[in-house]
Amino acid sequence: MRPKERTIRTGPRTGVRVDSMLSAALIAEFITPSDHLWLVSPWITDIQVLDNGHGAYDALFGDVPPQGCRLSDALARISHGGARVHVVTRGDAHNGDFLRRLVKAAPPNRIHIEQDPNIHEKTLCGIDWILSGSMNFTVRGMAKNDESVTYKAGGASAAQARLDLAQRWGDGE
């Protein structure tokens, strides 16, 4: 596959949001989970990442599809599909609800959480794609703040990022 790259600038002035880009990446992970999926962000809220209010994603969820899917649910579903999910965030109470929900919903041997007080990077990275930029995975980051987010599929960027992330924080095994 030829590498593809798209940078978007989100915020109230642009009227652009990152929702569809993030949803597409997570749906791809539902279908074919990466061996390792990395989420790195100092601030994480259990944001809704898929709106299934009109049933567009019913086939992904089985017999009782939810109206929506939160980030912790999406990552847990991906971990149940075989991915080892790595989360690097700050050890701040703000991130607590998200982390508790993720740990409760995912198989324990498929989740690796690192808390780093100095983390400032914002990245979501699978086997052959990476989403990175200035956006925290929070309501403000996704819907209110002016942000710059780049999505790259194919090429060497994701592989290099996964190597760098594993070197910095290990793989939790």
Model-derived segments and spans:
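PLD/PLD-like phosphodiesterase catalytic module centered on the HKD motif
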Residues: 1-173
